[in-house]
Amino acid sequence: MAHWPLLVVGLSVAFVSSQAADPAAPSPNKLPKIVVDVAHKGFMNEKGERFIPVGVNYYRPDTGWAPQFWKKMDVETTRRDFQKMKELGINVVRVFVTYGSFYSQPGQLDAEGLAKFDQLLDIADEFGIYVHPTGPEGWEMMPEWTNPLGNVHANHGNEVSLKSLEDYWTMFAGRYRGRSTIWAYDLKNEPSVIWDSADSQKKWDEWRTAHGQPFVPVPAKDAEPSEIVADYQRFRESLAKAWVARQAKAIKAADPKALVTVGLLQWSVPAQPVTLDQYAAFRPEVVAPHLDFVSLHFYPLAKGIYRYTGPDAENANLSVLESMVRECAKPGKPVVIGEFGWYGGGPLDPGGEPASEDQQAEWGKRLVEVTAPMVSGWFNWGLYDTPEAKDVSRLTGLLTFDGQEKVWGKEYAPLIKSMPVPSGIPVRPDLPWGTATVDELASERFQAEYLEAFRNAQP
């Protein structure tokens, strides 16, 4: 999830290698392998039958915040959760792998974490649910050896950190090579390239030299729009591209049939105003060639917190969403909404009216319907409401914290399963990337133009 105080948060999961765990033969596959359906920009099984990911981000409400799922994993509780997900119609779970449970030491994966992941895969097989591992993430701890600059967002151009990630994927994907229960690997939850770091000037100098340009210092975060600033944004995009490409290559070398994506922060598409450094630099058209599909996360924050105040506010957020999905769809790969959800009101929004379950369900329905022409799968943020969370995770679940089915939980899977094959990218204004990454006013103008086109297209 996007990192907004008291609003949204993201997660990730970790895994272990055969070098660090019992090299016993893997469990036999019980689920058919899911592959990309190139013709329909979606997914299918190896028999050619359509597969629509009806997904959920899985963590438990009784494991702390950030969730310490692996350290507190209970097999029977996990099995009951998968039973509930099966009853809800869920067919894929996104889980967050952590350094603390899976990759606490360089060069090896943790046997205890791998054993727990093996158990989770066996449970998933039992209930016919695929697993979408994300990570590794620093929720439980971030080892110094993989975070040499002391800031996870500063590591995208750091060779030590990137090599540790390549090693991780080589071990993890190698251990689970051919395990069809794993739907796809997500490289990381919501990566964003930091504006400036200890490595930035050196890397920037190298990039400028390679393009035949003279030395200039790293621009200030509040610099006025200029060609130098535009170049620096392209430089940041090049770091994101290399970071994705090297990890994807490591996974494919270990398991050629594995699917790979990365969970994009919505600020990867500057369709609404973002500051120079807030732009995540994971531009879809730049990273998509190295991915099997594009995964976008979205929360309704157009012009501030979405408060269910009427059609104008709803359309403002849906138009921003559609414009972002549109940019994700342009590279021609399948698109998935890897995180979404909203509730609003009450303690999450002081001064805002508490929202209802019906409003949560209506927002979810509109999000799915608006994105369906370009999207092939959806992942709700959270199975359960999570009272201890510091963001919308408190109330975005399909179930209440004590396991009662909510309105959205009842409607979610039937709605997604009714969605047709994606029909294509709608005719709308194109995002002016050249100016939107350097000038907030350009994004504001685009947002207004797109909103008008979106409104005019509504039935």
Feature names for model-found ranges:
Residues 34, 165, 205, 328, ...:
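Aromatic-rich peripheral "rim/lid" segments of glycoside hydrolase catalytic domains that contact
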